[in-house]
């Protein structure tokens, strides 16, 4: 028996990365998992180096970032890798979720895999928000103020929670210091959740585009899918490098190059682009508590999909109506992202409310109705064929 199978530790690596049997039909959308793993490694590595030079004191936070940019050897590179790495992390994550929605990866027997994935998504957004606050530019300060203030909408205890999180009566030194401590700690918890995600995946294996069991035809992970993953890794690194070296501030906000000033409010307060769809949902509800519930509900409603999708066939590869509904949902989500960065004025308010209503309707009405209708059509088709 080879050492990779007999050794206790190497056998674990072997079962995940070498001999792991994968369905032969999986396409390039299945490469996003390895890209997300790469993003996490890049973020943790660059973050550790940034933490060596960053000061979490509110008086020094902005200046310490400028010190990293100007005085630390290759500090500009580490900072831009970390800042753009966050954006690329979310690009890959949204594509990964989109793949799961399209191919029905959330259906039985992979519900636990899906639940852990949603928890990872929520934790990643929390980590990204706290990291954005640490720069302590104008948008960091006001973004932190607005988002943390949302907790004041919680009945009875909300007004006590907000100063508890701030450590004072506004976003101040204790806020930035505790955000820094959590921003450093939580990625390691995220890495543990990723390991749990892989363990849950390992129980039943990957799904596939066809939507049937992959046991009919499987191939070992190495060398076939390792080399297939390497193709997208190199493409990812090429595009990532283009942003880091040639357009590092495109995905950021120019106001964050102005030191945070509690006395000057920016014309519009917007979070980073990857949080904009949920920010648009928050703003589209006039009531504060209703907006907060809608925003968190928009994320947690992902957990309902294994139960609201009644289809007997996994995935949308052979389902015309489900494909149409999926592409409408994607368009609506992109529309919400655009609305989140626009001023709250006449055409955008109503448009945001319609987009929010459709977002929830997709999960609650569209998916159950279309999946049931397609089941009926499938049954009629099979009965006709039998006759």
From Swiss-Prot:
It is a multi-pass membrane protein. The chain crosses the membrane at residues 32-52, 85-105, 116-136, 151-171, 179-199, 225-245, 289-309, 324-344, 350-370. SUPFAM superfamilies: a domain/subunit of cytochrome bc1 complex (Ubiquinol-cytochrome c reductase) (SSF81648), Transmembrane di-heme cytochromes (SSF81342). It is found in: Mitochondrion inner membrane. Heme b b566 binds at residues 96, 197. GO terms for biological process: mitochondrial electron transport, ubiquinol to cytochrome c. GO terms for cellular component: heterochromatin; membrane; mitochondrial inner membrane; respiratory chain complex III. Its main location: mitochondrion. Keywords: Electron transport, Heme, Iron, Membrane, Metal-binding, Mitochondrion, Mitochondrion inner membrane, Respiratory chain, Transmembrane, Transmembrane helix, Transport. Its cofactor is heme b. It comes from the Eukaryota. Heme b b562 binds at residues 82, 183. One of its GO terms (molecular function) is ubiquinol-cytochrome-c reductase activity. Pfam families: Cytochrom_B_C, Cytochrome_B. Disruption phenotype: Leads to lethality, showing that it is an essential gene. Gene3D superfamilies: Cytochrome Bc1 Complex, Chain C. Binds 2 heme b groups non-covalently. Component of the ubiquinol-cytochrome c oxidoreductase (cytochrome b-c1 complex, complex III, CIII), a multisubunit enzyme composed of 10 subunits. The complex is composed of 3 respiratory subunits cytochrome b (COB), cytochrome c1 (CYT1) and Rieske protein (RIP1), 2 core protein subunits COR1 and QCR2, and 5 low-molecular weight protein subunits QCR6, QCR7, QCR8, QCR9 and QCR10. Component of the ubiquinol-cytochrome c oxidoreductase, a multisubunit transmembrane complex that is part of the mitochondrial electron transport chain which drives oxidative phosphorylation. The complex plays an important role in the uptake of multiple carbon sources present in different host niches. Heme 1 (or BL or b562) is low-potential and absorbs at about 562 nm, and heme 2 (or BH or b566) is high-potential and absorbs at about 566 nm. Belongs to the cytochrome b family. This is Cytochrome b. It comes from Candida albicans (strain SC5314 / ATCC MYA-2876). The gene is COB.
């Amino acid at each position: 028996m080879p050492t990779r199978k007999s050794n206790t530790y190497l056998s674990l690596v072997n079962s995940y990365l070498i001999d792991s049997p994968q369905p032969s039909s999986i396409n390039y959308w299945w490469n996003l998992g390895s890209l997300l793993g790469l993003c996490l490694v890049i973020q943790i590595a660059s973050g550790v180096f940034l933490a060596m030079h960053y000061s979490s004191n509110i008086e020094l936070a902005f200046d310490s970032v400028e010190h990293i940019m100007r005085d630390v050897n290759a500090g500009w590179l580490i900072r831009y890798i970390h800042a753009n790495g966050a954006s690329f992390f979310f690009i890959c994550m949204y594509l990964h979720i989109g793949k799961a929605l399209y191919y029905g990866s959330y259906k039985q027997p992979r519900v636990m895999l899906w639940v852990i994935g949603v928890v990872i998504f929520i934790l990643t957004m929390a980590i990204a928000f706290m990291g954005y606050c640490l720069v302590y530019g104008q948008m960091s300060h006001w973004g932190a103020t607005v988002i943390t203030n949302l907790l004041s909408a919680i009945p009875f205890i909300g007004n006590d929670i907000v100063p508890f999180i701030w450590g004072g009566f506004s976003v101040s030194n204790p806020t930035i210091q505790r955000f820094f401590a959590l921003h450093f700690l939580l990625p390691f918890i995220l890495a543990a959740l990723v390991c749990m995600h892989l363990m849950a995946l390992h129980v039943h294996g990957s799904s596939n585009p066809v939507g049937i069991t992959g046991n009919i035809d499987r191939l070992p992970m190495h060398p076939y899918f390792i080399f297939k993953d390497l193709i997208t890794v190199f493409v990812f690194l090429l595009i990532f490098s283009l942003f880091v070296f040639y357009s590092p501030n495109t995905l950021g906000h120019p106001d964050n190059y102005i030191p945070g000033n509690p006395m000057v409010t920016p014309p519009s307060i917007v979070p980073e682009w990857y949080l904009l769809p949920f920010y648009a949902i928050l703003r589209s509800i006039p009531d504060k508590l209703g907006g907060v519930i809608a925003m968190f509900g928009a994320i947690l409603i992902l957990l309902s999909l294994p139960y609201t999708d009644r289809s007997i066939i996994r995935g949308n590869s052979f389902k015309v109506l489900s494909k149409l509904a999926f592409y409408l949902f994607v368009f609506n989500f992109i529309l919400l992202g655009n609305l989140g960065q626009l001023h709250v004025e006449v055409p955008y308010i109503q448009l945001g409310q319609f987009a929010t209503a459709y977002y929830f309707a997709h999960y609650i009405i569209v998916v159950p109705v279309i999946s049931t209708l397609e089941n009926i059509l499938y049954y009629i088709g099979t009965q006709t064929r039998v006759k």
